[in-house]
Amino acid sequence: MDIKRTILIVALAIVSYVMVLKWNQDYGQAALPTQNVATNQAAPAIPDTPLGNNASASADVPSANGETSAPLETPVVTNKDLIHVKTDVLDLAIDPQGGDIAQLKLPLYPRRQDHPDVPFQLFDNGGERTYLAQSGLTGTNGPDARATGRPVYSTEQKTYQLADGQNQLNVDLKFSLDGVNYIKRFSFTRGLYDLKVTYLIDNESGKPWSGNLFAQLKRDASSDPSSSTATGTATYLGAALWTSNEPYKKVSMKDIDKGSLKETVQGGWVAWLQHYFVTAWIPNKGDANLVQTRKDSQGNYIIGFTGPALTVAPGAKAETSATLYAGPKSQAVLKELSPGLELTVDYGFLWFIAQPIFWLLQHIHSIVGNWGWSIIFLTMLIKGIFFPLSAASYKSMARMRAVAPKLAALKEQHGDDRQKMSQAMMELYKKEKINPLGGCLPILVQMPVFLSLYWVLLESVEMRQAPFMLWITDLSIKDPFFILPIIMGATMFIQQRLNPTPPDPMQAKVMKMMPIIFTFFFLWFPAGLVLYWVVNNVLSISQQWYITRKIEAATAKAAA
């Protein structure tokens, strides 16, 4: 029993070590390998659109056969030309050249906890970093496919703001060419991180107009600014898509380096994932779209879609649209927005345990209003659910402690003959009605819960910068003073004293080292996870002490 229990504890230590040092290797890979898919393209390939306001805005737009033309110089758009839009949850800037969202900040999510007035910036196209949401009209008559460059839109004003009491805000960008009038409309709603981009096409020319809507996310290979290094980990940074054939497929930067992906799909979505936040383009459900990943001529990574061809007769009007989400990974919101989009909150292979844990945490938090106390009450609830199992385990361990003198006598009797010693131990266990595996049950039960809670704390945006009390101001990062890990190590030491001492000296030495090893590992774990483990240990100590004393009292009474 002691050997198996030691193996289990060492295994948990190894798992802990892997989670701290190997997260990027295990979690950063695509869930499914991507392949180059040859399809009959229902629409032109997704174009390389220009870098934006601080770069030479080259056309670099491929023709209908997917070949890229040589870049052409077009007017440079400066910061003063950007169109600024502010709602209660979004603060963004639109580049009039092409109508791309070149900058986007999230006012309700501070960049750092010690600078609450500096919002987290999701999109940025200022030179040092490239990350933006692009859309346009390509194809036969699309203004974004012109050899002379993308359209430069005009607006009635340079600044727009959602006023108090106003629930909707429309920002219209206008452009005319060859008798065709275009309006690119951005529609914002109070409290929402999703916005609708609609193209209104008024064909006043004397010939039919034909084009395709495209929408894409473009990003360079820079690091994730939302990923904390305080835990010693890095979360997944890369693209993802959802189709009816392949729900939730990750496409990493390495996958895109290996080759482009092209698939014609119905509806779905394309997204770019990072720690706590996600951006996604969502086309109309009924459209057949060409989804594509690729690397552009500047080395940026692109995931996007091109919609079906749209034809507008002379004198007629038409519109086409798509939805952009740019904000936190809020599961409830994402689930309502598009099927499968909530899967971007990736809880790993134990998602079926992690999701109920998060659901419980949310409901507890709605009552207590503090995520730290929510973790404590969740731990108490879990311990209560598994108490019958734990009680049986502690009873087995108490009986093991009671027969410790007999085990010592067997050790003296058989010396170094391990085979005879093992046989004698099994006979003793059978005689005393002891389950040699009984003491392993608490560890087996805790491991999947421990791992699942790890994903929940690290992936759920609700935990970002969530304070507890005293020195714990952020449950999603390590304890800045390492107080909780030290307390955790102390509780492990106390818990170890309640367990029977292994008869083998080497096993005993290994067991004594476990609190020190675990304390070292937990130094870099999120404070919320260490809090869970501390509370779990305290409750385990209380349960074990109570059950052990109860059994000892019953044994003494029977002996009397």
From Swiss-Prot:
Which protein, by its recorded name, is this?
A: Membrane protein insertase YidC
The cellular location(s) given in this protein's UniProt record come to:
Cell inner membrane
Database matches in HAMAP family: YidC_type1 (MF_01810)
Q: Which family does it belong to?
A: Belongs to the OXA1/ALB3/YidC family. Type 1 subfamily.
Q: How does it assemble?
A: Interacts with the Sec translocase complex via SecD. Specifically interacts with transmembrane segments of nascent integral membrane proteins during membrane integration.
Give GO terms for biological process. protein insertion into membrane; protein transport
Using the UniProt annotation, give all residue ranges assigned to the region (Disordered). Answer: 43-72
Q: Which residues cross the membrane?
A: 7-27, 367-387, 437-457, 468-488, 515-535
> Origin organism of this chain?
Pseudomonas fluorescens (strain SBW25)
